[in-house]
Amino acid sequence: MNHLNEIKMNSEIIISVYKTSISPKDVCRLTPVLDNFTKISNWNIDLKDWENILRVESQFSVENNIIGMLNNLNIVCIELH
């Protein structure tokens, strides 16, 4: 096993879940922001949920970054615990 595979196997994925005010229109401007944030490995938005849930997967703690990025776009974002 090479060193990179060993790191990947030992890395924990942190899943953060947020209640948001994301609308379908917001998704277009939010997508490049989240896609280009290199610390995020995966993300999705459930617009069918009344809380417009944003789910983020990362190997890093990104909660403050996510909340700040969405707030800068005038989107309400509250982490759910």
Pin down the residues of each PLM region:
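Short amphipathic beta-strand starts and helix->beta connectors
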Residues: 2-5, 35-42
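C-terminal structural segments of small proteins and small subunits
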Residues: 59-81
